[in-house]
Curated annotation (Swiss-Prot):
<comment type="function">
    <text>Catalyzes the dephosphorylation of undecaprenyl diphosphate (UPP). Confers resistance to bacitracin.</text>
</comment>
<keyword id="KW-1003">Cell membrane</keyword>
<feature type="transmembrane region" description="Helical">
    <location>
        <begin position="1"/>
        <end position="21"/>
    </location>
</feature>
<keyword id="KW-0378">Hydrolase</keyword>
<dbReference type="GO" id="GO:0009252">
    <property type="term" value="P:peptidoglycan biosynthetic process"/>
</dbReference>
<keyword id="KW-0472">Membrane</keyword>
<feature type="transmembrane region" description="Helical">
    <location>
        <begin position="244"/>
        <end position="264"/>
    </location>
</feature>
<keyword id="KW-0573">Peptidoglycan synthesis</keyword>
<dbReference type="GO" id="GO:0046677">
    <property type="term" value="P:response to antibiotic"/>
</dbReference>
<feature type="transmembrane region" description="Helical">
    <location>
        <begin position="218"/>
        <end position="238"/>
    </location>
</feature>
<dbReference type="GO" id="GO:0071555">
    <property type="term" value="P:cell wall organization"/>
</dbReference>
<dbReference type="InterPro" id="IPR003824">
    <property type="entry name" value="UppP"/>
</dbReference>
<keyword id="KW-0133">Cell shape</keyword>
<protein>
    <recommendedName>
        <fullName>Undecaprenyl-diphosphatase</fullName>
        <ecNumber>3.6.1.27</ecNumber>
    </recommendedName>
</protein>
<feature type="transmembrane region" description="Helical">
    <location>
        <begin position="144"/>
        <end position="164"/>
    </location>
</feature>
<dbReference type="GO" id="GO:0008360">
    <property type="term" value="P:regulation of cell shape"/>
</dbReference>
<dbReference type="Pfam" id="PF02673">
    <property type="entry name" value="BacA"/>
</dbReference>
Length: 266
């Protein structure tokens, strides 16, 4: 891979992974516009690892507190709001794990194409707009309860369909269930950690058995660029989301979906 290609794709991954705008919709654009070949499994692992490092480091204090509270609850059988949140994150992860293990190949074969990505980008953009407009926005992530956590987890599993956007689907569900914008974003980011880690392990297993050569310099650059882009994206999204709302991202998704349809049929 050329250096420009590595930087551009890693930037796209880092900037779109945690925004509700679909990373898969953006990663398909270079191949459609520039005619680039698929970047390969090893590069996918690299840029996803960079994004995972970003969210873990950004929320390192919260993750440590939640982990300690969770382990303490196992020993003491007493629950705090932090241990409950940790349990809810685990619960919300289960649907995506089940769907990922049982339907990953089917989804990759039947849904990873430009038409599906364009349609889901538009449809789930409209759902995000409706959720943001109708949300009661009263609950924090510590107040939602296990049923709401499970429903958000089901939304995350649905986001395995390309173009849906994991963060977009989970924030949409959280807003519909009454969480504030800040709480919806924080819970979405925190619940991305176990799912991203599991996905990285799953893809790494496939990578080990792949005979394709590995460009370690490109992978290292991809990890660094993806990490920096994702970290800055998380920081500024959380800083401004309560003020700007979801409308800018909805409009962007509609435009992006229209562009993809145009590239497909024009």
């Amino acid at each position: 891979m050329e250096t420009f290609q590595v930087i551009l794709l890693a930037l796209i991954q880092g900037l779109t992974e945690f925004l509700p705008i679909s990373s898969s919709a953006h990663l398909i654009l270079p191949s459609q516009i520039l005619g680039w070949a698929d970047q390969g499994l090893s590069f996918d692992v690299a840029v996803n690892t960079g994004s995972l490092f970003a969210v873990v480091i950004y929320f390192r204090h919260e993750i440590v507190v939640l982990a300690k509270a969770w382990f303490t609850s196992l020993a003491s059988k007493q629950q705090t709001q932090e241990s409950k949140l940790a349990w809810w994150i685990i619960l919300a992860t289960i649907p995506a794990v089940i769907v990922g293990f049982t339907a990953k190949d089917f989804i990759e074969t039947h849904f990873r194409n430009t038409l599906v990505i364009a349609i889901t980008t538009i449809v789930f953009g409209l759902l995000l707009w409706a959720a943001d407009r109708m949300s009661k926005a009263q609950l924090t992530e510590f107040q939602m309860g296990w049923k709401k956590a499970l429903l958000i987890g089901l939304a995350q599993a649905m986001a395995l369909i390309p173009g849906t956007s994991r963060s977009g689907a989970t924030m949409t569900a959280a807003l519909m269930l009454g969480l504030t914008r800040d709480a919806a974003a924080r819970f979405s980011f925190l619940m991305s950690v176990p799912v991203s880690f599991g996905a990285a392990l799953l893809v790494t297993k496939d990578l080990v058995s792949s005979p394709a050569p590995i460009d370690y310099q490109a992978l290292g650059l991809g990890i660094v660029v993806s990490f920096v882009a994702a970290y800055l994206c998380i920081h500024f999204f959380l800083k401004f989301i309560s003020k700007i709302g979801m409308t800018p991202f909805v409009l962007y998704r509609l435009a992006l979906g229209a562009i993809l349809l145009g590239l497909l049929y024009l």
